[in-house]
Amino acid sequence: AIHIVELDEDVNLINIYKAECNAKKTFKDRFPELMDNFARILVEEINIDTVDYAVIEEPIFAQNRNVVRTLSEVVGAVWGTLCLSDIPTTLVDNGTWKKQILGSGKATKDDIMKYAIEQWGDNFPEQDYADAACIALYSVKENRNGST
């Protein structure tokens, strides 16, 4: 799944989105559906003309190389889709955004969820939404500073 969080420049939570696909299929069989659903969200649910920039979390290093490959393929496809939509996009390492937003590059999932709920309320039905919200906050702060 691809989790998307939209914040405004005042870091108010606008909306959360999730592009999904049939997880019972092989990755190669479900990938087109996943990307189609991501593109549909961009076109039909988010007014992409109002999106100033986006940030994507870089693929994490996992012990299983198949997981790394799958994450890398999804990140590359999302990045390409955003670029083709003329949305300036950067990638950020998970340790970087965690350190900037939470004060520690090794922040836990519980730390992230607690921070997200304190910042935006209990609006995160899944951990990945809280992660995406903090990554979006990182992007807003970096753009204010002219870093991205």
Question: Which residues does each PLM region occupy?
Answer:
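Phosphate- and other anionic-substrate recognition elements at nucleic-acid/protein interfaces
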Residues: A1-T148
